[in-house]
């Protein structure tokens, strides 16, 4: 868990889209063809040519032109291309089998080449993986092509590995997964049409005035298309790749077995419990009805919030594998670096305020730290929140103890950090002193913003490097897995801290947390829990 947290603070948090507009982070697409009036036989099926029955062709054209004037047109990555998604488990297994054979042959060819006169072994990388014959350029391309073809859980893991630090993964392997993170292919029109018909019915065109044929975003689970409802509402329609929901467990097992065998992933990177948690989270993300319900929950929770807004769900375009939402504008957080210091400070303060509200007030958090899920609109000075597939609840038995761990760190009380970590079941109490000291130090480092009496300079700290130095001890000497809630929670908190660091925020966090702390226990109508004896 600390490995993931430290690495998150060193890298970007998932695929960063350019003006992404729907809960589906990823690369963005080429200029699309519209399914609309008089454009094709499909377009004609949604054309409303009778008075009062919908938008005319001119209406749609004017709406589209108005939209283009508001914001730059998103585009898919140059590496993205149309490619069929293997939908059956057999076809997906065949893809992994082909990759295994290809990696083996590629490694053999690499060894042979280096064994010839004039050949030499590579020595790059600090993790001991740099000299692996499996990490040739040809094999790198095989891995990228396979993951971008199968997509789903396998691509999701590849994107997760892209944010790991090269203290644990060789620079070559890191570059491979960085290419995976930036390159997501989209399914062909016929396959997308099949999903739409299976989910919305053969008459699905009657629900929209137009829908773009090529997506503006493509990621690990699905792709996103821009559309227009008959009342003129612009929408973004997320369509899930076929077969990904049914292949989560097999994809995870096949990919990790292959990578451990060929390139030697670090021991402890994906422990058994973290794998189970990952599979559960992926299953949640594949259930678009659940995501729609979570989005509606957040829309209600934040209805009166002056800074954050949540787009409305389009119920008639919502099924298990299709999700329609109101189209939102704005720029991802990473593109806010050019704004004034004051605006950046306000954005980051509000982001931390949201994290604390989610965990300690709502006890319900959207845990995906992808910056493209937070779109800042300068005209309204608001942030639109997107992608609620990874939302989850937290019980009071967890938050009661977790808030005390943070409070102890904010107060600089190392002994209480250790004790409350045991109460939280983060520790057993029988760990080595080296492990206990490393754990407490990591918590104290993360608590520094809440301990500072004045504005904390997120851009000047070395939080990531300091935590990264503790991770080897934390991996080697852990006696029990951390609470399962912390995997997703710490990814989200790390993403928030990283955003503050990237935007060089200077904000006073101590009063923000202290106010949250007192409000929390007031709402619980009880006193803070004493440390267990």
From Swiss-Prot:
Sequence motif: AAAS motif, positions: 217-220
GO BP: cerebellar Purkinje cell layer morphogenesis; ubiquinone biosynthetic process
Keywords per UniProt: ATP-binding, Cell membrane, Cytoplasm, Kinase, Membrane, Mitochondrion, Nucleotide-binding, Transferase, Transmembrane, Transmembrane helix
Membrane topology: Single-pass membrane protein
Entry keyword annotation includes Oxidoreductase: no
Limits of the Protein kinase domain: 192-424
MF-aspect GO terms: ATP binding; protein kinase activity
UniProt-annotated binding residues for ATP: 220, 238, 325-328, 373, 387
TM annotation in the entry: 93-109
GO cellular component: cytosol; mitochondrial membrane; mitochondrion; plasma membrane
Superkingdom: Eukaryota
Pathway noted in the entry: Cofactor biosynthesis; ubiquinone biosynthesis
PANTHER family: ATYPICAL KINASE COQ8B, MITOCHONDRIAL, PTHR43851
UniProt subunit comment: Homodimer; homodimerizes via its transmembrane region. Interacts with COQ6 and COQ7. Interacts with the multi-subunit COQ enzyme complex, composed of at least COQ3, COQ4, COQ5, COQ6, COQ7 and COQ9.
Family: Belongs to the protein kinase superfamily. ADCK protein kinase family.
This protein's name: Atypical kinase COQ8B, mitochondrial
């Amino acid at each position: 868990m600390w490995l993931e947290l430290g690495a998150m603070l060193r890298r970007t948090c998932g695929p960063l889209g350019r003006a992404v507009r729907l809960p589906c982070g990823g690369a963005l697409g080429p200029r699309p063809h519209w399914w609309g009036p008089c454009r094709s036989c499909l377009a004609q099926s949604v054309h409303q040519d009778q008075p009062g029955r919908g938008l005319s062709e001119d209406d749609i054209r004017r709406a589209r032109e108005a939209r283009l004037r508001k914001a730059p047109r998103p585009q898919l990555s140059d590496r993205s291309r149309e490619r069929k998604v293997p939908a059956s488990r057999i076809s997906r297994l065949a893809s992994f089998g082909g990759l295994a054979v290809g990696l083996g042959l590629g490694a053999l060819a690499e060894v042979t080449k280096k064994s010839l006169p004039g050949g030499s072994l590579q020595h790059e990388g600090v993790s001991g993986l740099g000299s692996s014959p499996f990490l040739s350029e040809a094999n790198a391309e095989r891995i990228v092509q396979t993951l971008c073809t199968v997509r789903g859980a396998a691509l999701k893991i590849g994107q997760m590995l892209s944010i790991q630090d090269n203290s644990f993964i060789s620079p070559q392997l890191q570059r491979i997964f960085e290419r995976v993170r930036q390159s997501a292919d989209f399914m062909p029109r016929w396959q997308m049409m099949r999903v739409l018909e299976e989910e919305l019915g053969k008459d699905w065109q009657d629900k929209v005035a137009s829908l773009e044929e090529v997506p503006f975003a493509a990621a690990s689970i699905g792709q996103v298309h821009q559309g227009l409802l008959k009342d003129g509402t612009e929408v973004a329609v997320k369509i899930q790749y076929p077969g990904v929901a049914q292949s989560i467990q097999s994809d995870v097992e096949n990919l990790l077995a292959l990578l451990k065998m060929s390139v030697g992933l670090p021991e402890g990177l994906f422990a058994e419990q973290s794998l189970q948690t990952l599979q559960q989270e992926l299953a949640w993300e594949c259930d678009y009805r659940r995501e729609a319900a979570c989005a509606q929950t957040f829309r209600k929770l934040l209805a009166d919030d002056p800074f954050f807004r949540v787009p409305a769900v389009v119920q008639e375009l919502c099924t298990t594998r299709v999700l329609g939402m109101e189209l939102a504008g704005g720029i991802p957080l990473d593109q806010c670096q050019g704004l004034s210091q004051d605006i950046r400070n306000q954005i980051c303060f509000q982001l931390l305020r949201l994290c604390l509200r989610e965990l300690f007030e709502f006890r319900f958090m959207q845990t995906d730290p992808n910056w493209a899920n937070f779109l800042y609109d300068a005209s309204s000075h608001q942030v639109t929140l997107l992608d609620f597939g990874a939302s989850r609840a937290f019980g009071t038995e967890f938050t009661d103890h977790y808030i005390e761990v943070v409070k102890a760190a904010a107060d600089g009380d190392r002994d209480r950090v250790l004790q409350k970590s045991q109460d939280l079941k983060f520790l057993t109490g029988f760990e080595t002193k080296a492990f206990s000291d490393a754990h407490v130090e990591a918590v104290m480092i993360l608590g520094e913003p809440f301990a500072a009496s004045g504005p904390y300079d997120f851009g000047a700290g070395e939080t990531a490097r300091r935590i990264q130095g503790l991770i080897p001890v934390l991996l080697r000497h852990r006696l029990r897995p951390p609470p399962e809630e912390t995997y997703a929670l710490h990814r989200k908190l790390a993403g928030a801290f990283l955003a503050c660091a990237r935007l060089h925020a200077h904000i006073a966090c101590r009063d923000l947390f202290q106010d949250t702390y007192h409000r929390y226990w007031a709402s619980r109508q009880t006193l803070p829990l004493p440390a267990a004896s």
